């Protein structure tokens, strides 16, 4: 009986084709216009790349106030981005207003960061939902699970 199980297991291992998804990594620009976001060309680049690669999924961690400047300085790219961000290709993973280090501020301040940031993103991109929160370690704090649940994060 053990021999039969061994043969079946061997056949399963031989016949099973292991498949892994292609992973992509896109760096940077989370600092907004005061950090690293090159306003003159970056938004158009994002839109063009998503159009060229419809199978791509990206996460944006860009300060919400950045979109005020993008709307003024590159209105064409901004309009195109508005159409793209409501698709399944784009997710905003940190909608806090100033992307603060949460470990050194109070719960009320963190709640306001989420309120102001989500309101700003919704002003520019109505219909966007927030599912995932993904940031660097200094942005974590003990009250974060409750706050994320309050704002509807999954």
What are the roles of these predicted feature ranges?
Residues 4-16:
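Sec-dependent N-terminal signal peptides
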